[in-house]
Curated annotation (Swiss-Prot):
Promotes RNA polymerase assembly. Latches the N- and C-terminal regions of the beta' subunit thereby facilitating its interaction with the beta and alpha subunits. The lineage of its organism: Bacteria, Pseudomonadati, Pseudomonadota, Alphaproteobacteria, Rickettsiales. It comes from the Bacteria. Residues 104-138 are annotated as: Disordered. The gene is rpoZ. Keywords: DNA-directed RNA polymerase, Nucleotidyltransferase, Transcription, Transferase. The keyword Iron-sulfur does not apply. The RNAP catalytic core consists of 2 alpha, 1 beta, 1 beta' and 1 omega subunit. When a sigma factor is associated with the core the holoenzyme is formed, which can initiate transcription. It catalyses: RNA(n) + a ribonucleoside 5'-triphosphate = RNA(n+1) + diphosphate. This is DNA-directed RNA polymerase subunit omega. GO terms for cellular component: DNA-directed RNA polymerase complex. Belongs to the RNA polymerase subunit omega family. Residues 126-138 have a biased composition (Polar residues). GO terms for molecular function: DNA binding; DNA-directed RNA polymerase activity. NCBIfam families: rpoZ (TIGR00690).
């Protein structure tokens, strides 16, 4: 059902990425307490937002402007903040790869005594298919 709704919405905007922005803004509005323009029972707010856009019940340009304003407000708050950038983790938050390297495991994952398929994302197995893994590890 969502696929049909998206195809219907493409008549309003020819850019799928802009459609995502529009639908997310409208879903945000609905989650914040805005009343739906169309009646649609048992629907999630994302589907209702897409249905409203497809039914041409919303002004797409004003919806896009609301999204831009929300983004600007977030960016201003983020830029003016004295808080450290989100990518800088506190020192007490050690990731599993660093902890495993300290423990002496070069894979970044715990050693296991189980079968050879316990680590499908290991260095040697990451790009191989399951059939290749079974043939090379036998």
């Amino acid at each position: 059902m969502a696929r049909l709704t998206v195809e219907e919405c493409m008549g309003r905007t020819n850019n799928k990425f802009k459609l995502v922005i529009l639908a997310s803004q409208r879903a945000h509005d609905l989650n914040s307490g805005a009343c739906p323009v169309i009646k649609y029972k048992n629907g999630k707010n994302t589907v209702i937002a897409l249905k409203e856009i497809a039914a041409k019940q919303l002004d797409v340009s004003s919806l896009f402007n609301l999204s831009v304003q929300r983004c600007r407000k977030y960016m201003e708050k983020f830029i003016n903040s004295d808080e450290p950038y989100i990518a800088h983790k506190p020192k007490n938050n050690v990731d599993i790869f660093q902890a495993s390297a300290v423990a002496g495991n070069s894979d970044g994952l715990e050693n296991s005594s189980n079968s050879r398929d316990d680590n499908p994302l290991g260095r040697d197995n990451f790009f191989s298919t399951p059939e290749n893994r079974n043939n090379t590890n036998s």
